[in-house]
């Protein structure tokens, strides 16, 4: 069974834990208890393939930023979450992405931009179009979610797995588009 290491990043209070717990336990937590780091596992079937999601729910607070490099190194795909009710959390997403790309030393990493709390339309500070534009500039999918109303919760995680699958298929293409990883040869003199 394939295992996917998913990492949820974003500022404090955007609903990363609420999304994760809604996916894992089908229940909404409405009290805010800042996360340092929590790990969850769930077996699911995505596009007729049974797989294991290993989800790392991370700290949004700046005081835990030293831990970020480690989980960014090991993660295969990233849910970059902001709250539609917080302009500053939206503005932070680009720096999370830059840090992920720097740590992984890649130009592109499987990720999805997620605008959470879409049930709070009356408090919206970030338009859907702005979220779509940001995701387009990153070359990744975009979704608005609500952990409270269970809108697009499963879909956002499942779409991230599809992005990882797509990325791993393109990674294994060698010269001429045939499968198999490229091997590099070193010669020490």
UniProtKB/Swiss-Prot annotation:
Family stated for the protein in its record: Belongs to the small GTPase superfamily. Ras family.
Propeptide: 187-189
Primary location recorded for the protein, binned into one broad class: membrane
Keywords: Cell membrane, GTP-binding, Hydrolase, Lipoprotein, Membrane, Methylation, Nucleotide-binding, Prenylation
Single GO MF descriptor: G protein activity
PANTHER family xref list: RAS, DI-RAS, AND RHEB FAMILY MEMBERS OF SMALL GTPASE SUPERFAMILY
Protein name, entry field: Ras-like protein 1
Topological relation to the membrane, as annotated: Lipid-anchor
Pfam families: Ras
GO biological process, one term: signal transduction
Record-listed GTP binding positions: 10-17, 57-61, 116-119
Cellular component per GO, a single term: plasma membrane
Location in or out of the cell: Cell membrane
Lineage: Eukaryota, Amoebozoa, Evosea, Eumycetozoa, Myxogastria
Record-linked InterPro entries: P-loop_NTPase, Small_GTP-bd, Small_GTPase, Small_GTPase_Ras-type
Free-text function comment from the UniProt entry: Ras proteins bind GDP/GTP and possess intrinsic GTPase activity.
Motif Effector region mapped to chain: 32-40
Residues that bear Cysteine methyl ester: 186
Lipidation sites (S-geranylgeranyl cysteine): 186
Catalytic activity field: GTP + H2O = GDP + phosphate + H(+)
EC numbers: 3.6.5.2
């Amino acid at each position: 069974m394939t295992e996917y290491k998913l990492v949820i990043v974003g500022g404090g209070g955007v609903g990363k834990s609420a999304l994760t717990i809604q996916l894992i336990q089908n229940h909404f937590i409405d009290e805010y208890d800042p996360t340092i780091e929590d790990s969850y596992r769930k077996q699911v079937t995505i596009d007729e393939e049974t797989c294991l999601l290993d989800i790392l729910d991370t700290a949004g607070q700046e005081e835990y930023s030293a831990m970020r490099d480690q989980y960014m190194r090991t993660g295969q795909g990233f849910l970059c979450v902001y709250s539609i009710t917080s302009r500053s959390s939206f503005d932070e997403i680009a720096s999370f992405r830059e840090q992920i790309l720097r740590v992984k030393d890649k130009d592109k990493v499987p990720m999805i931009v997620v605008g959470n709390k879409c049930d709070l339309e009356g408090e919206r500070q970030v338009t859907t179009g702005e979220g779509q534009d940001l995701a387009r500039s990153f070359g990744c999918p975009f979704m608005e979610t609500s952990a409270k109303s269970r809108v697009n919760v499963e879909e956002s995680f499942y779409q991230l797995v599809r992005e990882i699958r797509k990325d791993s298929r393109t990674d294994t293409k060698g010269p001429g588009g045939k499968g198999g990883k490229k091997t590099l040869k070193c010669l020490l003199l």
